[in-house]
């Protein structure tokens, strides 16, 4: 614990050179020190921090300032119209005691169940802001390994409108760093997120609308950004898609899976997603579009532009069959059980140290992909494009070198540029 605090504090010092306090007295400002917080890294400050947040909420909102120090804390709940502002040298450190994270209802892996409340949470609270600079450290590994009930996440916002996360860093989180559920008009900007191990997602966007993620540096043990909308019949009936998502000017990396994952929890659907002006690298895929038999839902209107893809076995992975594994909670109906994918396009992409441009053979013939366009793809790769069961495919200006075998390999695919000659 002490070593993690020292490492994290040193990182924050290097990232933010300013030493000016964010806690100068002003109307509507609530200093956690005034409510008894010690910030010594030893005393549990949970009660004092929550008391400050409650006082701010009772006043109708304001600014809760966290001055320099290391604040050891359990779960905290932020109210409406509250801005939590961290000093550049303020560190929030998750408690190692599971009793400091009460059991609540959560959606985890697409299903509603019991889980431990996140280190920082807000529910049904509009106009919540968390502002850096400053750093938030997740609970220890032992808590993050909890699966049933789910261990504590770092930040979880549920049914929140107009939430903003800006300018802070997170460290050593073993589960999802940020989970957004049923949120609208959300912005994440200038965040630096780091996590370890599988399940250490960066930002999970779950049945949310109008989301912007910009100028973030996310390097995780699992998916850097994951787009979800629940799974099974309950999520399909609920019908709350993730939609209108913009990801721009970000650096996204995953040491285990994908820089950007779409699915497999997508029974509510995912649509209108833009990713632009980003650099991506993934241990398995830079971008992974995934589902399985029985999951249902849809992926539609997903576009990518001006992307740099580095050190990834695959630029785009498409897998809707999951090695034949059927969903344990299938959406009923032969037509409805297959995920629909339509109107997906990528333009002006630079690939480097990428094994394969597209791995897209795991698609059901019962629900072919409808509309996939790749334009202006340059760089080097070992293999080209593999597609199965797709229509209205357009390949234009794919000027890659270094590959072996055919540039384009297809099975039951209709479209333009499929012979591998017109595209170069």
Q: Positions of the model-derived regions?
A:
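Short amphipathic alpha-helical "recognition" segments used for binding
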Residues: 6-7, 54
């Amino acid at each position: 614990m002490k070593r993690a605090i020292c490492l994290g504090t040193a990182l924050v010092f290097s990232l933010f050179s300013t030493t000016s306090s964010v806690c100068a007295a002003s109307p509507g400002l609530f200093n956690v020190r005034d409510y008894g917080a010690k910030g010594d890294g030893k005393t549990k400050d949970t009660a004092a921090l929550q008391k400050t947040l409650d006082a701010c909420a009772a006043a109708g909102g304001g600014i809760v300032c966290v001055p320099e120090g290391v604040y050891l804390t359990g779960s905290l709940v932020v109210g409406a119209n509250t801005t939590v502002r961290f000093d550049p040298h303020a560190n929030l450190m998750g408690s190692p005691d599971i009793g400091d994270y009460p059991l609540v209802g959560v959606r985890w892996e697409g299903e509603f169940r019991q889980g431990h409340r996140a280190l920082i949470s807000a529910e049904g609270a509009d106009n919540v802001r968390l502002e850096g600079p400053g750093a938030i450290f997740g609970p220890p590994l032992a808590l993050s390994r909890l699966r049933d009930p789910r261990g504590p996440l770092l930040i979880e916002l549920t049914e929140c409108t107009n939430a903003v996360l800006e300018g802070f860093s997170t460290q050593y989180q073993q589960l999802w760093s940020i989970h957004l559920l049923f949120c609208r008009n959300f912005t994440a900007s200038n965040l630096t997120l780091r996590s370890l191990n599988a399940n250490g997602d960066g930002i999970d966007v779950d049945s949310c609308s109008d989301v912007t993620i910009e100028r973030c540096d996310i390097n995780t043990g699992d998916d850097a950004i994951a787009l979800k909308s629940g799974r099974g019949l309950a999520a399909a009936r609920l019908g709350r898609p993730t939609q209108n998502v913009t990801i721009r000017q970000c650096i996204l990396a995953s040491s285990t899976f994908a820089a950007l994952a779409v699915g497999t929890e997508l029974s509510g659907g995912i649509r209108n997603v833009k990713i632009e002006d980003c650099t991506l690298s993934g241990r398995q895929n830079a971008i992974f579009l995934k589902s399985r038999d029985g999951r249902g839902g849809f992926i539609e209107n997903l576009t990518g532009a001006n992307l740099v893809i580095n050190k990834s076995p695959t630029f785009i992975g498409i897998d809707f069959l999951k090695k034949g594994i059927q969903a344990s909670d299938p959406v009923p109906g032969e037509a409805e059980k297959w995920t629909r994918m339509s109107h997906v396009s990528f333009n002006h992409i630079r690939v480097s140290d990428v094994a394969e441009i597209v791995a897209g053979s795991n698609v059901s013939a019962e629900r072919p992909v409808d509309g996939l366009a790749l334009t202006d793809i340059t760089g080097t790769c070992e293999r080209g494009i593999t597609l199965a069961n797709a229509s209205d495919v357009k390949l234009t200006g794919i000027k890659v070198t270094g590959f072996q075998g055919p540039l384009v390999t297809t099975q039951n695919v209709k479209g333009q540029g499929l012979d591998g000659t017109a595209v170069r």
